[in-house]
């Protein structure tokens, strides 16, 4: 089919009215303002973390460091407990995400089969857990009875599957062509082979999106650590940084420690160190993220 572009004055040319151009300009302006509003807190955190305490105290709006200083990063990176906490968080994130994905993928694939007897009941039970939970105290008792107290596994196993992620992936699997599975089965492939050799490769956007959700949840989790982790050497990064912020505030109240430790630049350096790993990973998964979440949420 041959397509031709219509020049101005020719029949079929789309002429934008003045009202349409005004709307586009206002819309663009609002989007720019929204972007600035969203990015400024992060930019402020970054600028303060690279500023000296004197520079921070001299102004209330921080657009650029007037006096550069990396003492906050030097202090945090020189703390051996930071690296121990980093290692704990990396283990929790990697191991937790692998377990999450294995269980979620298998459960979503099975529940996507309409011919499965009782699949509606199973889906109802899964959705039921989104509205009603066991509560903090019963969950704590279960973790204690299982012998998981003061163990990194207490931050992994209780959250082995997320119902919201299960539903997204289940909807994605349900909309895939059944002919692919039937052809693979006729060629002698097993159900497990169909899942891991056929379905997963073509479900990369949805699977990558779910993996990113799980990884971010594990990386940012500190409530579970507060509940179940007692030893300081087993603290994840988030709990360690939280402790550093509280210790800085306590030092300020008591008048102890050096003036630097009481400053906001050290706190902002701690915050930046916590979000840098996720910032570095997100650009590599961004192209899958939007496609996966929209497709998985709409399909099925």
PLM segments and residue spans:
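A hydrophobic, multi-pass inner-membrane permease signature
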Residues: 2-300
